[in-house]
């Protein structure tokens, strides 16, 4: 009998009932909620005269709509947008009513859901984790079964602690070798998406493995798993190892004492068996990956920084040719234009993909002693949580950014999506460390280019895309 993949093990350990129609009922260990997808779910509970089944499994924080400027210091009443103000207030009210742990807007522990969950130790190896947000795959970096759910499913999990789901196929993405200097986890995942496309992972749970993945920090692994959904996969994961255990140890929600010892023992099995069979295997050579930049309106439209924008006339597939033509028109680019010739208007360093302390350190390392280019209208740095902000300030990173001409903000989702005051104007090009570059994602008519934090900082100080390795020396 063939061995099991990590995904198989996680699925089997949470399976409550297999149903005749091919779907299954799975148990949920951790439910993370925010202000956008939870209000309707709580209202549904009230209408059905139900209460949350397991209060201690839920943590909450507002993130999508919260302002990242000093406006927030005036409290919820100071939020200018009426809908945003109502959603943040409703989350507070619902959590207060049911006794749910919430890190409110001005709590120093508040932040982006996919940053604070791991930061607090609320995400643990072997758990099943859901949230009403597609980037919940981030938590798979801990050897957890994690994926986003819709609002109706948020209500279902609140009421029953279970979820109806169908088992996915197994994909292994193996990245072997040593990454070149200046190449990061963000570049790996963009390269993966460029290789398999945004539909490549449809119907799969992706396990990321190989020496290059093992060499990444836990924060780097979170970046990789975060963008699994951009590759078409709801689930992305990395097997548990000593780095995972060391990261979790001592965090507020982590087990303590004898329970910790038992947990660590159980976590040793959270790896794919040596003889496990994957339905699909994708291989990348880490040494061949260069700093990546997305040029179009889909994450799969990505190239190395030293390449040129594609020429649709050279694409034989009529559907792909049409997609390239539409993307070029929306992005205001020309066929064969060098990536390094793209002029930028704004720079955003933040989001659940790249707002952790290592991301900020990498960006600050590039920004130190330099100035934001005069052609850049705005460059903002948004920490993923209040604790990360405090740590960065302790290290003096805020001063590095401010001295260089960046704006240093309060935590939140910010310019990743146009649901708060941070957004692009029509026609503006932005170097962004976020995860999506769809039309209008950062504001109506806005043009998003996905990059790593170091590449974003390099773009800010030069006004265009440049290989960050030209500005840094190997240690």
Curated annotation (Swiss-Prot):
Comment on bound cofactor: Binds 1 [4Fe-4S] cluster per subunit.
Catalytic activity reported: (2R,3S)-3-isopropylmalate = (2S)-2-isopropylmalate
Record keyword Iron present: yes
GO process terms (BP): L-leucine biosynthetic process
Chain residues that bind [4Fe-4S] cluster: 352, 413, 416
Leader peptide range in chain numbering: none
Function of the molecule: Catalyzes the isomerization between 2-isopropylmalate and 3-isopropylmalate, via the formation of 2-isopropylmaleate.
Alphabetized Pfam families for the sequence: Aconitase
Disulfide bridges in this chain: none
A molecular-function term among this protein's GO annotations: 3-isopropylmalate dehydratase activity
Pathway(s) it belongs to: Amino-acid biosynthesis; L-leucine biosynthesis; L-leucine from 3-methyl-2-oxobutanoate: step 2/4
Protein name: 3-isopropylmalate dehydratase large subunit
Keywords: 4Fe-4S, Amino-acid biosynthesis, Branched-chain amino acid biosynthesis, Iron, Iron-sulfur, Leucine biosynthesis, Lyase, Metal-binding
Similarity comment: family membership: Belongs to the aconitase/IPM isomerase family. LeuC type 1 subfamily.
Record organism: Pseudomonas syringae pv. tomato (strain ATCC BAA-871 / DC3000)
EC number: 4.2.1.33
Subunit structure: Heterodimer of LeuC and LeuD.
Reported cofactor(s): [4Fe-4S] cluster
